[in-house]
Amino acid sequence: MILSVNSAWLERFQADRPREKDHRPPFRRDRARILHSAAFRCLQAKTQIHAVGENDFYRTRLTHSLEVAQIGSSLASQLRFTEAFTSLTEQLNCSSKELESVLKPLLPSNDLIETLCFAHDIGHPPFGHGGETALNAMMRHSGGFEGNAQTFRIVTKLEPYTEKAGMNLTRRTVLGLVKYPAILDEASPQYSLLDLPHPTDLGHLRQIDWRPSKGLYRDDLTMINWLLKPLSDTDRRLFTSFRKVRSNFQEFLKTVYKSLDCSIMELADDIAYGVHDLEDAVVVGLISQSQWQAAYDELKNCSSDWMRKNVDTLTQKLFSDYHYERKNAIGALVNYFITHVRWKMTADFTDPLLRYNAELPDDVICVLNIFKDFVFKYVIRDVETQRIEFRGQRILTDMFQIFESDPERLLPRNTVKRWQNAEAEGRKRIICDYIAGMSDAYALRVHRQLS
């Protein structure tokens, strides 16, 4: 059996011949477009964990993305080793050598996986989840807002590398950035049918009411259809399907499937979130060893033999007074996750980029989830973090209403042109794009000018 990647995945929305004597492969050109974009540069001014932002050590969205790229490249390299094929070899009852010869050519190049990891957060608005909440509430009747959907919109429309196709990346690169291939307003709660506090009442804009679902904007349907054109009808229906059928108006629906490249990028993001964000929080004293006890107990009793054996040493090093010991523990954890990555197959797909994914075994995923849940509980949900995000939430909601009240007077000239050229029902999206593209500091500065 020989699998090959459909040449359509190398196409761009607009024909784009390399310049004279430019011999770079397509994904290296994509990588350069991300690195030189304003959206990527803006990540340096967006904080990864707001509560640690007063410390010089803290990570930004930019440094986080660089670390995700390093982990992603390591995962892709690890998938070339024989042990990564063992589980699938047993499942298919075939030789490892045969499977390796078939699957290795499907793996993303280092240029491609780094491109995806560099770009994966560029759609996140200022003030993290607080910003998402504010913009989703303000866009509730206009398609909603969500960070991953905004990433898709930036690379396919907003970033001014071309007039109308954004960065004009290869189709495979764009596919790798799509974590949730459904339309956002179909995945979101049916807001018009719910009795929720009016979102312009800033005192009652609760995150639990207005946190976004996951998907892509209906406004970008032309690019979505272009992206999925190489898929068979059967593959497209399965790829865009939800995990379950909606049973009530409040439900958040999620898709199940991702491309091979996206699965590698998402694992890298999860590892960086679970391990490196924990490192930040320990160093600045956001979490204590007594708080860690609950996670320690779970790790001590988890199904991973390696973790049960090493959790005491890891804990001692993680909370050591010596930075090199903490770094040693962090390195050991990252290595543990990377070296357990393996191939996974979903036989219902025919396109090989959807049929095969990267995954971690159940016992390793269990460990990663313990780390992620701990970071969420003690770092993301930390009261200082939540107060900063809530402040940002109020700022963005206020700014949106101000800009909407007199857009031709208050928006920048280029944004005004886009607003004037948009259909009436699409004008809110133009305001949303402008606010979502701000850094934390710039949003504060603009709001002060308007207040």
Curated annotation (Swiss-Prot):
One short Pfam name that applies is: HD_assoc
Q: Which InterPro entries match?
A: dGTPase (IPR006261), dGTPase-like (IPR050135), dNTPase_2 (IPR023023), HD/PDEase_dom (IPR003607), HD_domain (IPR006674), PHydrolase_assoc_dom (IPR026875)
Determine if Hydrolase is one of this entry's keywords: yes
* Positions of the HD domain: 61-274
Q: What Gene Ontology terms for biological process does this UniProt record contain?
A: dGTP catabolic process
Which keywords label this protein? Hydrolase
A GO term, aspect molecular function? dGTPase activity
Domain of life, source organism: Bacteria
Family as reported in the entry's similarity comment: Belongs to the dGTPase family. Type 2 subfamily.
Q: Could you identify this protein by its name?
A: Deoxyguanosinetriphosphate triphosphohydrolase-like protein
Species of provenance: Actinobacillus succinogenes (strain ATCC 55618 / DSM 22257 / CCUG 43843 / 130Z)
